[in-house]
């Protein structure tokens, strides 16, 4: 995921790892993220609750040929560019077939066209377009629009802008130049309780990858059983102390 507004991409990755019961296979060592350590966020029993987790971990599901990188910390100042380089170098050396970045963008910075349409958008690098163009077309998804690079200037060049998207735009631009097959899926959101946004984003991804199947013939999102990680019980802290009442 990208560390972006509402942490939507990170929450969506949590849902994928928890639902598919992906196994932790290693760590992505980097000095670009603020150090952190905590208990196992996906603990299902007392036996595995004491396992430690850190700021960047790698999970795998070999049966689906799926690998997920989860980030749990923010970037150290001026280190985001270095992180992008390390990440894409790892992607190339590991020979990943495709990369999908889950992200979000500030909903209040949408233009009129974006306000009148779906809150979901996608971006594909040129080499990714060749391999998935037909599939994406069949989903009737909406591509992220290009907007003036300098909003106040009407004659400004047009480019992709993702306000609140963290490293999303930098990863996308670097992947274009390095000919990496990358897709960006994002949702326009506001800060707050972003669990519904994460569920929406992961269902958007599921339309394409079909990671889990509907429980009935009705493919509506409500029939998809996403498993909420145990750590989400403390998403907004440990609750109010009873002594207050």
Named regions from a protein language model:
Residues 1-98, 107-245:
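Accessory terminal and edge-of-domain segments that mediate assembly/interaction
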Residues 103-105:
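Internal, hydrophobic cores of structured domains that mediate oligomerization or house catalytic pockets
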């Amino acid at each position: 995921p990208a560390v972006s507004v509402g942490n939507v991409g990170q929450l969506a990755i949590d849902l994928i790892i928890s639902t598919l019961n992906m196994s932790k296979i290693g760590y992505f060592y980097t000095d670009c993220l603020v150090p952190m350590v905590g208990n196992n966020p996906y603990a299902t029993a007392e036996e595995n609750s004491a396992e430690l987790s850190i700021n960047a971990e790698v999970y795998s599901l070999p049966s689906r040929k799926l690998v997920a990188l989860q980030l749990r910390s923010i970037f150290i100042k001026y280190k985001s560019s270095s992180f992008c380089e390390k990440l894409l170098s790892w992607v190339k050396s590991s020979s990943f077939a495709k990369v999908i970045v889950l992200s979000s963008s500030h909903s209040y910075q949408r233009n009129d066209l974006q306000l009148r349409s779906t809150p979901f958008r996608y971006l594909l690098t040129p080499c990714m377009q060749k391999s998935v163009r037909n599939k994406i077309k069949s989903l009737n998804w909406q591509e992220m629009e290009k907007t003036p690079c300098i909003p106040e200037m009407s004659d400004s060049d047009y480019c992709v802008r993702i306000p609140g998207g963290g490293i999303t735009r930098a990863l996308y631009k670097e992947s274009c130049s390095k000919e990496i097959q990358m897709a960006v899926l994002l949702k326009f959101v506001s800060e707050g309780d972003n669990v519904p946004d994460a569920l929406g984003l992961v269902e958007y991804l599921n339309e394409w990858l079909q990671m889990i199947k509907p429980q009935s013939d009705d493919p509506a999102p409500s029939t998809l059983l996403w498993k909420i990680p145990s750590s989400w019980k403390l998403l907004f802290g440990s609750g109010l102390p009873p002594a207050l009442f």
